[in-house]
Every structure is written in C-alpha cells, then in structure tokens.
Amino acid sequence: MTGRMTVALERGRVRLLLMFGLERQALARILRRLEAHPADAFSLATGAHLHASLGDPAAAQRMLERLVRLHPERADGWFNLGYVCESLGLLAASEAAFRRAIAIDPRLDRAWYGLSLSLIAQQRLDEALQTLRKNTELQPMSPYGWYQMARVQVDRQEPDEAEKIILHLRGFEPRVAAQLERETGLGAVRA
C-alpha cells in the first residue's frame, strides 16, 4: 500500500470514529499518527479540535501553536488558535492570531469576527466596530456581526446607530432584531 493510500485510510478511520461519536478513540489515533508524522497538518488540526471538544482547550492551544509553527501559511490554523486563545482569556494572543489569519486571507470573515470579539473583550470598541464592519461586508446576511455591531454601538453610547442596525436586521433576521430590542430597550420596544 502506498503512503498516500495509508494516509487516506487512516483519515477515513478517524472520520468514521467521529461519525459514531467516538472522539476519544479518534484522538488516540490522531496522537499515534503524530508520533510517526509530527508535522501532519490534518492530524494537528483535527487533534486540536478534538482536544477542545473534549474540554481541554490548553492542549488544543499547544497543538495549534505547533500547527502554525510548522505551517505558518495556514490561515485556518491561525484562526483556530485565535479562537482557542480567546476561550482561555488570552486576549493579546487571540488578537495576534486573528490578525495573522487576516494577513494571510483578508476574506476570512470568521477571523474578522473573532478579532472583533477579542477587541470588545479588551474594551477597544472603536477598533471592534471597524472589524465588525469588515465582517458584515464579507458576510452581509449573517446576523452575528450585525448583532455585535449593535451591542458595540450601545456601549459607545450611540443608540441611534444601534437602532439602524436593528432595523436592518428586521429585514432578514427578525428574531435577532427582537432579541436586541429586548436586551437594549431600543427599536420597537422603545417606540
């Protein structure tokens, strides 16, 4: 059997284990694969995901740091590292990872969104607003960026701007608009 066939077979086994919800067994296979092939990007990314989903974000962080050290060109690796660092409260590291992902792939809307969350957590609202604008430009029909943008506008003491966003959301995500109205007292609730 060729090396490529062996890799494909092993990845298939991992996917099969995951389909049946056997995450720990899948992680054990991934870790064995990494012993033999320590730079395998698929195994590093999958292992990090499994560590995170099994409740060990610190192990996920270590694996993702290894991934981006070995494969610095992977925007997805940097994005995932940013996400894990944010979940651990490592906001400077999270911000740096999201910025690196954006530098590699400026159209990676999730990285713009993740960066905005890191900036919001650091109370850097003006910068967060700019990143949310970029996120909503890339994903205009996703409510997440719009929701956060409205919250930032409220925190910036700009209720009229937040109401404009709520009105915009009513056009394609009325439940999210209603949620914002309840949370902020703006929009139809205030009228």
Predicted features and spans:
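Structural marker of alpha-solenoid helical repeat scaffolds
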Residues: 36, 70, 104, 138, ...
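TPR/TPR-like alpha-solenoid helical repeat scaffolds
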Residues: 117, 147-157, 176-191
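Helix-start (N-cap) detector for alpha-helical repeat units in TPR-like alpha-solenoids
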Residues: 7, 41-42, 75-76, 109-110, ...
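Structural signature of tandem alpha-helical TPR/SEL1-like repeats
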Residues: 19-32, 54-66, 87-100, 122-134, ...
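Alpha-helical segment of the N-proximal tetratricopeptide repeat
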Residues: 6-55
